[in-house]
């Protein structure tokens, strides 16, 4: 059973003071809260001097509250002409405010009009109150706030980041919290806190922090006298030039291109077809929604993270003038049986989802929502829906601007690494492009190019069907269940899709159309009137590539040759113990969830390259690590001398 997220609340006293049971009295006025946050946390960590002339600087704040620490750091960063290029703030919060209550709290505490635009931007970007990590970008992506909603200590243990400064407050000012922070601390990381108890001082000293009292606060830095960590926090990949090759111009590849270009990388995008988004990403539409399970398992948490991150990135693209077609009326996931609806209800009740994330509809409510007969109710996702994948790819490509160069109608025969540089070669051995970094986003061909023996990709044929305008009842929003139905802008209804593992036939089949018609008739009995002749229908065939656990493969690729040679020593390896091929990354195996995985996967790879905080908890990043199958083989002693 997942831990339900409990939001903070606000109450107004008779004297006009706002009080939160979670945060206590909220002090009024700019001369109070914001100034105290600056003095305690910003100045207490030696800022702004310590971030000056650096590429990135990362702050971990252990209690976001109403955002005073973040707003103070942002204001100091903006006012500093020698500021770092990119400021990351990772903020843990077990009890997030609603957007309305956050507005009330910040307005009550902070009357400084010089940051009113910052406050408005924070409120506009404030995420849904669901557990996990939420990445928000401000100032054209130069200020990044990663909100971690959930239990403070649990999340601190799961974060992946190299912290330069800690704003230590709340539950983290404890032995367990400080031990978790020590695992995140980079060289010479500093901290500042109001907590000065003997227990806090003991925990700081025990984990390698020095400390001293300055007025009413405790400050210090991370300076361990011994090596106490098995794994160091992540670093940026050492490269002499910020150039990358991305192979594959579908949803995965275009998302990576946009994220790298936004960080100042020059990218060569190689696509074997004449244009981008030519394979599964060329479908007329794709459905987009998270999963919900009673135990909030890895797949549920990953799809939630991907769903919310994609929404944020898409809105940013649209605000930047790179619009694309997507539905805006939500999506209804209908149960396939009474037992299936009971499972949906159990998952919904266990999770405690806010209404802007999901709403449970019984059969009558679902029927009223669709204005069509249905056998069961289901889950309504107000921000789910359908997206035109090719339009999204084009928007991401356009956002990359002059930093991307497309090599279309170009096939990569093999990769070679020479002198710290990867070379993409054609079948004659000629170099198509070279760069210190390569990202394989080419679905079924990725394992071949990387020489991965422990990744078994499987093709799945999917045929979709297009029903002409006027042949179906109106459908107000996409609906899914056993199959899906998506209304397109021109009145066409898209239905599908077949699921045919290991079938690589690209030809359209009347039998596939018949299967899709039969499936949607059971999903929505009143949607289609007289059945058309399947042989007369239009459609499209595309291939999705999956692995056995149906999760994507995202991240640095393992050096399987070196791992095999050291198989015995790696029998109990974690993902962080494996040797990797320097500068070689993957984003493939997305199956039918490319719209959910692509944006988050691209952000993860870009963060790994740059040594930035990851947008996923360690457990979830390990779950999509392309080396996970190698790790399982090593543990089972099925590799090399261990076999």
UniProtKB/Swiss-Prot annotation:
Enumerate the InterPro entries for this protein.
Answer: FAD-dep_OxRdtase, FAD/NAD-bd_sf, MnmC-like_methylTransf, SAM-dependent_MTases_sf, tRNA_MAMT_biosynth_bifunc_MnmC, tRNA_S-uridine_synth_MnmC_C
Question: Which GO molecular function annotation, any one, does this entry have?
Answer: flavin adenine dinucleotide binding
**Annotated stretches, region: FAD-dependent cmnm(5)s(2)U34 oxidoreductase:** 247-643
The record's annotation in Pfam families points to: DAO (PF01266), Methyltransf_30 (PF05430)
Reactions listed under catalytic activity: 5-aminomethyl-2-thiouridine(34) in tRNA + S-adenosyl-L-methionine = 5-methylaminomethyl-2-thiouridine(34) in tRNA + S-adenosyl-L-homocysteine + H(+)
Sorted alphabetically, which keywords does the UniProt record give? Cytoplasm, FAD, Flavoprotein, Methyltransferase, Multifunctional enzyme, Oxidoreductase, S-adenosyl-L-methionine, Transferase, tRNA processing
Name where it's found: Cytoplasm
> Which Gene3D superfamilies has this protein been placed in?
D-Amino Acid Oxidase, subunit A, domain 2, FAD/NAD(P)-binding domain, Vaccinia Virus protein VP39
> GO terms for CC?
cytoplasm
Q: Name one GO biological process term.
A: tRNA wobble base modification
The ranges of region (tRNA (mnm(5)s(2)U34)-methyltransferase) come to 1-223
The cofactors named for this UniProt entry are: FAD
Which function does this protein serve?
A: Catalyzes the last two steps in the biosynthesis of 5-methylaminomethyl-2-thiouridine (mnm(5)s(2)U) at the wobble position (U34) in tRNA. Catalyzes the FAD-dependent demodification of cmnm(5)s(2)U34 to nm(5)s(2)U34, followed by the transfer of a methyl group from S-adenosyl-L-methionine to nm(5)s(2)U34, to form mnm(5)s(2)U34.
Q: Which family does it belong to?
A: In the N-terminal section; belongs to the methyltransferase superfamily. tRNA (mnm(5)s(2)U34)-methyltransferase family. In the C-terminal section; belongs to the DAO family.
- Its name, as the record gives it, is tRNA 5-methylaminomethyl-2-thiouridine biosynthesis bifunctional protein MnmC
Natural source organism: Burkholderia orbicola (strain MC0-3)
């Amino acid at each position: 059973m997942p831990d339900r997220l409990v939001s903070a609340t606000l109450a107004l006293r008779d004297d006009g003071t706002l009080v939160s049971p979670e945060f206590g009295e909220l002090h009024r006025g700019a001369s109070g809260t914001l100034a105290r946050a600056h003095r305690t946390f910003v100045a207490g960590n030696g800022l702004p001097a310590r971030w000056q002339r650096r590429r990135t600087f990362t702050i971990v704040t252990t209690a976001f509250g109403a955002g005073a620490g973040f707003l103070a750091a942002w204001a100091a960063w903006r006012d500093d002409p020698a500021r770092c290029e990119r400021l990351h703030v990772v903020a843990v919060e077990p009890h997030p405010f609603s957007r309305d209550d956050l507005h009330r709290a910040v307005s009550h505490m902070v009357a400084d009009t010089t940051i009113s635009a910052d406050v408005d931007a924070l409120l506009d970007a404030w995420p849904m109150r669901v557990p996990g990590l939420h990445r928000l970008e401000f100032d054209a992506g130069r200020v990044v706030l990663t909100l971690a909603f959930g239990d403070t200590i649990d999340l601190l243990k799961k974060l992946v980041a190299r912290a330069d400064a800690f704003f230590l407050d709340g539950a983290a000012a404890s032995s367990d919290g400080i031990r978790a922070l020590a695992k995140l601390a980079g060289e010479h990381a500093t901290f500042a806190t109001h907590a000065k108890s003997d227990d806090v001082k003991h925990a700081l000293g025990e984990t390698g922090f020095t400390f001293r009292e300055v007025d009413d606060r405790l400050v210090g830095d991370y300076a361990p006298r011994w090596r106490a960590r098995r794994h160091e926090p992540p670093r940026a990949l050492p490269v002499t030039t910020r150039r990358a090759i991305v192979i594959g111009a579908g949803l995965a590849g275009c998302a990576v291109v946009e994220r790298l270009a936004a960080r100042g990388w020059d990218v060569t995008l190689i696509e074997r077809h004449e244009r981008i988004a030519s394979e599964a990403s060329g479908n007329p539409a794709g459905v987009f929604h998270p999963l919900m399970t009673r135990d909030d398992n890895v797949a549920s948490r990953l799809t939630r993270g991907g769903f919310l991150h994609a929404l944020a990135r898409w809105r940013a693209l649209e605000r930047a003038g790179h619009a694309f077609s997507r539905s805006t009326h939500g999506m209804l996931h209908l149960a396939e049986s009474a037992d299936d609806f009971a499972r949906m209800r159990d998952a919904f009740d266990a999770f405690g989802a806010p209404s802007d994330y999901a709403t449970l509809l019984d059969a009558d409510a679902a029927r009223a929502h669709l204005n069509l007969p249905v056998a069961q109710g289901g889950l309504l996702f107000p921000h789910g829906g359908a997206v035109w994948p090719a339009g999204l790819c084009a928007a991401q490509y356009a956002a990359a601007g002059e930093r991307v160069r497309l090599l279309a109608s170009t096939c990569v025969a093999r990769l070679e690494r020479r002198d710290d540089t990867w070379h993409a070669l054609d079948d004659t051995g000629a170099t198509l492009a070279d760069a210190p970094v390569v990202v394989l986003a080419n679905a079924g061909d990725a394992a071949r190019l990387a020489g991965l023996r422990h990744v078994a990709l499987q093709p799945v044929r999917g045929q979709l069907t297009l029903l002409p305008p006027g042949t179906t009842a109106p459908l107000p929003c996409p609906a899914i269940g056993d199959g899906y139905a998506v209304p397109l802008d021109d009145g066409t209804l898209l239905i599908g899709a077949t699921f045919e593992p290991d079938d690589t036939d690209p030809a359209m089949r009347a039998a596939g159309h018949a299967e899709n018609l039969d499936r949607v008739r059971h999903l929505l009995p009143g949607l289609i009137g007289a059945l058309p002749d399947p042989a007369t229908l239009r459609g499209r065939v595309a291939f999705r590539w999956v692995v056995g656990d149906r999760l994507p493969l995202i991240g640095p690729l393992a050096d399987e040759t070196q791992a095999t040679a050291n198989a015995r020593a790696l029998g109990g390896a974690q993902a962080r113990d494996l040797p990797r091929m320097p500068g070689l990354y993957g984003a493939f195996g997305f199956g039918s969830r490319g719209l959910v995985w692509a944006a988050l996967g691209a952000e993860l790879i870009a963060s790994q390259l740059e040594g930035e905080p990851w947008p996923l908890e360690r457990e979830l990043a390990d779950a999509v690590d392309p080396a996970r199958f190698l790790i399982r083989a090593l543990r089972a002693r099925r590799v090399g001398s261990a076999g």
